[in-house]
Amino acid sequence: MTNSAPIRIATRKSPLALWQAYFVRDALQAAHPGLEVELVTMVTKGDIILDTPLAKVGGKGLFVKELEVAMLEGRADLAVHSMKDVPVDFPEGLGLVTICEREDPRDAFVSNTYNNIDELPQGAVVGTCSLRRQCQLLEYRPDLIIKELRGNVGTRLGKLDDGQYDAIVLAAAGLKRLELEERIRSFIEPEQSLPAVGQGAVGIECRLDDERLIKLLEPLNHKDTADRVLCERAMNLTLEGGCQVPIGSYSLLDGDNIWLRALVGEPDGSKMVRGEISGLRKDAEALGVTLANQLLDDGAREILTKLYADQE
């Protein structure tokens, strides 16, 4: 990339993906007035395959592969991701270089009839495509019927409005970003249901040899968010957790200290392995690894081994 070349952002065409791309474009141009930034839109396999559970067709990595190929082939310079959708591994030559300030990491309960999970009647139908949400919902309410829910935010809300579900669970951050917060009947606190790794944060991936771009992106990095997400992702990497596994985590900062809580669950909610750890913020990555190993020793290894065997 030459010093005068425009920055090209690879993005999916969904409203939320475009919001994230425009957010990064605007932040780059605010930090570097006069900088040219273009969007390169594309359709990914994850956008096309809507009739099969994600876990059976490759997980949420389906949403990023085409963007990564575009960067490796020089058709785009960076890609913007919702951190909860980013696989733990990157192709050679690419990496996560910037994490922007985190939005609300909680899940949101959305319904046209009921205000919260407790109000749902026996056998109510709840929509989600997340095994993490499914296992925590079923642990709390084993009577619920969990029904697969795919598509972008608007599509999911449309299916709720068509009467296919009594309620659906979505990421609060996505609804807020799309100015759909009025659809949220209640927030599901981390104490009741742990969010996904990195939920609510936006990350930027680019070629690791693109020194000019990495320098331009520096002002967009949010250190507090980056430390929290680093801790959560280190835990997930050690668990070898893909994006479609029942793993939840949530971290908080307190001055120079960081606290991490995590869980691994059976998809049907019948068994949950939980743990938490705290320590110095500078040791965030090591703390995530330590907690993951504790979870594995406490029973998570058996849950994950069985799950991966079933998905093959």
From Swiss-Prot:
Its EC number is 2.5.1.61. The keyword Transferase applies. GO terms for molecular function: hydroxymethylbilane synthase activity. Pfam families: Porphobil_deam, Porphobil_deamC. The modification S-(dipyrrolylmethanemethyl)cysteine is found at C243. Pathway: Porphyrin-containing compound metabolism; protoporphyrin-IX biosynthesis; coproporphyrinogen-III from 5-aminolevulinate: step 2/4. It catalyses: 4 porphobilinogen + H2O = hydroxymethylbilane + 4 NH4(+). It comes from the Bacteria. The keyword Transferase applies. Keywords: Porphyrin biosynthesis, Transferase. GO terms for cellular component: cytoplasm. GO terms for biological process: protoporphyrinogen IX biosynthetic process. Belongs to the HMBS family. The porphobilinogen subunits are added to the dipyrromethane group. PANTHER family: PORPHOBILINOGEN DEAMINASE (PTHR11557:SF0). Tetrapolymerization of the monopyrrole PBG into the hydroxymethylbilane pre-uroporphyrinogen in several discrete steps. Monomer. This is Porphobilinogen deaminase. The lineage of its organism: Bacteria, Pseudomonadati, Pseudomonadota, Gammaproteobacteria, Vibrionales. The gene is hemC.
